[in-house]
């Protein structure tokens, strides 16, 4: 088995999907988790205005609506939270996403004060916090806020990790990679677009250029620029298609470098890192 085949098998990617079937699969998955854990009454998710959180948010809202109808328990709810660092440049996109999602509860926690305070506290030791490192502090501040809300509302935190993000490990360890449940896992980027289209989303919500937008020295830098490979190439790779040698090398390099992000803290019994 080639490395490409191993990755596809591990991430559970299908070359062709039925969007309606995958929507139902994700919604049922989210509902099943709530049923199994009756002490949970909510899902919490940060909404950025990008494709992934828009999709995960709408799926979560559908899941809790069905839970309320099926259980006659009106305490189930989806909590969407905006987590800007100061003023977000594409705030309009985030508001459009919220309009589409129609969450039960919409909150805002501005992370600027906490992220800046942590940066100052670390630099007070004499350590230098790079722009990239501060970007990770921002991502982890968002994780802390989501878990604080989940703790207040008997909730679980939804993550937006999907196959195209996972294969490149394009997420912050214990930041946006920190979550309880991943309803998009198994889907690549173009398949996520198919689900949003099937859900009736405005194409503008999934056709915008993806960006993590964590670095102040590189504001709005596109994911594809940071990765050195396009999402079309990543998706083709995950669907078992042939890609250029350069694209394959880049994708597989990210896969190897990011292995530590896909595991719990390493123990003496782990072998994957050797």
From Swiss-Prot:
ATP binds at residues 46-53, 160, 189, 211. Its EC number is 6.3.1.5. GO terms for biological process: NAD biosynthetic process. The gene is nadE. Disulfide bonds: none annotated. Catalyzes the ATP-dependent amidation of deamido-NAD to form NAD. Uses ammonia as a nitrogen source. Homodimer. This is NH(3)-dependent NAD(+) synthetase. Pathway: Cofactor biosynthesis; NAD(+) biosynthesis; NAD(+) from deamido-NAD(+) (ammonia route): step 1/1. The lineage of its organism: Bacteria, Bacillati, Bacillota, Bacilli, Lactobacillales. Keywords: ATP-binding, Ligase, Magnesium, Metal-binding, NAD, Nucleotide-binding. One of its GO terms (molecular function) is glutaminase activity. One of its GO terms (cellular component) is cytoplasm. Belongs to the NAD synthetase family. Signal peptide: none annotated. Mg(2+) binds at residues 52, 165. It is an enzyme of class 6 (ligase). It comes from Streptococcus gordonii (strain Challis / ATCC 35105 / BCRC 15272 / CH1 / DL1 / V288). Transmembrane segments: none annotated. NCBIfam families: nadE (TIGR00552), PRK00768.1 (NF001979). Pfam families: NAD_synthase (PF02540).
């Amino acid at each position: 088995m080639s490395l490409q085949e191993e990755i596809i098998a591990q991430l559970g990617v299908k070359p062709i999907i039925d969007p309606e079937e995958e929507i139902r699969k994700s919604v049922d998955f989210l509902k099943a988790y709530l049923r199994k854990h009756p002490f949970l009454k909510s899902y919490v998710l940060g909404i950025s205005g990008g494709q992934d959180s828009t999709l995960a948010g709408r799926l979560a809202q559908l899941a809790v609506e069905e839970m309320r109808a099926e259980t006659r328990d009106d305490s189930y709810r989806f909590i969407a939270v905006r987590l800007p660092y100061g003023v977000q440049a594409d705030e309009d996109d985030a508001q459009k996403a919220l309009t589409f999602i129609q969450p039960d509860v919409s909150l805002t926690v501005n992370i600027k004060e906490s992220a800046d305070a942590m940066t100052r506290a670390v630099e007070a030791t004499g350590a230098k916090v790079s722009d990239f490192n501060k970007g990770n502090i921002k991502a982890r501040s968002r994780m802390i806020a989501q878990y604080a809300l989940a703790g207040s509302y008997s909730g679980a935190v939804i993550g937006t990790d999907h196959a195209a993000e996972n294969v490149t490990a394009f997420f912050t360890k214990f930041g946006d990679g920190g979550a309880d449940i991943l309803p998009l896992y198994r889907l690549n980027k173009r398949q996520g677009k198919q689900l949003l289209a099937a859900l009736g989303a405005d194409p503008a919500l999934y056709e915008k250029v993806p960006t993590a937008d964590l670095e102040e020295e590189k504001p709005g830098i596109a994911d594809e620029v940071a990765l050195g490979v396009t999402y079309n190439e990543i998706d083709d790779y995950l669907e078992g298609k042939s890609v250029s040698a350069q694209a394959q090398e880049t994708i597989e390099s990210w896969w190897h470098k990011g292995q530590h992000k896909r595991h719990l803290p390493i123990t003496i019994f782990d072998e994957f890192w050797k």
